[in-house]
Amino acid sequence: MALKKPGSLTIAGSGIASIGHITLETLALIKEADKIFYAVTDPATECYIQENSRGDHFDLTTFYDTNKKRYESYVQMSEVMLRDVRAGRNVLGIFYGHPGVFVAPSHRAIAIAREEGFQAKMLPGISAEDYMFADLGFDPSTYGCMTQEATELLVRNKKLDPSIHNIIWQVGSVGVDTMVFDNGKFHLLVERLEKDFGLDHKIQHYIGAILPQSVTVKDTFAIRDLRKEEVLKQFTTTSTFYVPPRTPAPIDPKAVQALGLPATVTKGAQDWTGFQSVSPAYGPDEMRAVAALDSFVPSQEKAVVHASRAMQSLMVDLALRPALLEQYKADPVAFANTRNGLTAQEKFALGLKKPGPIFVVMRQLPSAIASGQEPSQEEIARADDATAFIIIYIVQG
């Protein structure tokens, strides 16, 4: 048997809820990896990774740009991880949620690493779907469940099955392949829902809570209401739709008898499918993206983590200590004022008990940091919770 080359790649997920969804296995790897690459959406998780890493760390979202195709960014994310693997380092890549669900760079990097003879594996993480099963309280094995990305659903003209659970991801970025999210094509998804389920069927709009200050979104709408402007503006890049069964499929008595099952059986079978890749790893588009890496200059307009050590430590404690979180929620202003080492802006943001202000005080532009500029209380209070997070992956197109 041929020996594996020095260097390895492990891909892990940070889950959805800040810090608390990171598994003990992933934490152990964070502490041992030679180099960590991460793409996470909240600053508390970013701080936690940096604090616990022994080696270098790099934020993969640096490769995003509003004037750049996301696929190009994904190729570059994969390639920078692979370069360190090829250099003999033990590399850990961390992605928001489950690292294999709606994440293109992770699959690409693992496939190429294995093909080149390196050890490469993926560890599971908590996805938005896992979070949804817990928060909305339905079992996908009852009646069956179909999960699809909104744009993929439309471009392949797939029908939604009214007899099963349907989960539709990325409803806030229909038809978008850049980092500009206007959702101008959302009406096309509504048309499909109207056609397959009717105007009166109810769906649930879901966003799992991320920061300790976040509140899980579980709003119910009739399909006819999805065209209303005041409803449409509630959907963001982190939004997922749950469409419950309209009419469950009837039980087939002959099948029940042939299988020797009780007459009261109600559950259907699950189908399992594998993943196939039919595209070359390094075609013309991929080679252009790789070539651009050597001249890539990170944008100075990308906010970076900038928070006091006290704030970083407190956000970890709020994520991992339920009793402390309850104490904070009971009186956030009084709680914040008793914490030593926090800046005035951090105390103010904590007192608002909302995720948006936390993002504002924990991430700043490099130019603002260099000049000593701090966000005003007005800017902190104005922070929009709905747009505080940017979902950073989409299914391969």
Swiss-Prot record:
This protein's UniProt keywords: Methylation, Methyltransferase, S-adenosyl-L-methionine, Transferase
Chain residue ranges for the region called Methyltransferase domain: 1-246
Name of one Pfam family that matches: TP_methylase
Pathway: Secondary metabolite biosynthesis
One GO process term, biological-process aspect: methylation
Modification type N-methylvaline: residues: 395
Positions carrying N-methyltyrosine: 393
UniProt-annotated stretches for the region Clasp domain: 247-365
Region Precursor leader, residue ranges: 366-388
GO molecular function annotation: methyltransferase activity
Binding site for S-adenosyl-L-methionine: 96, 98, 101, 128, 170, 208, 239-240
Active site per the UniProt annotation: 70, 74, 96
Top-level division of the source organism's lineage: Eukaryota
EC number: 2.1.1.-
Residue positions where N-methylisoleucine is found in the record: 391-392, 394
Post-translational modification remark: MroMA automethylates at Ile-391, Ile-392, Tyr-393, Ile-394 and Val-395 before being processed by the a prolyloligopeptidase which likely forms a peptidyl ester upon removal of the follower propeptide, which then undergoes macrocyclization with the N-terminus of the modified core peptide. Peptide backbone alpha-N-methylations change the physicochemical properties of amide bonds to provide structural constraints and other favorable characteristics including biological membrane permeability to peptides.
Disulfide partners: none
Domain notes: Within the homodimer, the clasp domain wraps around the adjacent subunit to position the core peptide into the other subunit's active site for iterative intermolecular methylation.
Known function: Fusion protein of the methyltransferase mroM1 and a type I borosin core peptide; part of the gene cluster that mediates the biosynthesis of a type I borosin, a highly methylated cyclic peptide with potent biological activities. Type I borosins derive from the C-terminus of the fusion protein, and it is the same protein that methylates its own C-terminus using S-adenosyl methionine (SAM). The C-terminus is subsequently cleaved off and macrocyclized by a prolyloligopeptidase to give the final product.
Subunit structure: Homodimer.
Family to which this protein belongs: In the N-terminal section; belongs to the precorrin methyltransferase family.
Protein name (database record): Methyltransferase/ribosomally synthesized type I borosin cyclic peptide precursor mroMa1
Protein species of origin: Mycena rosella
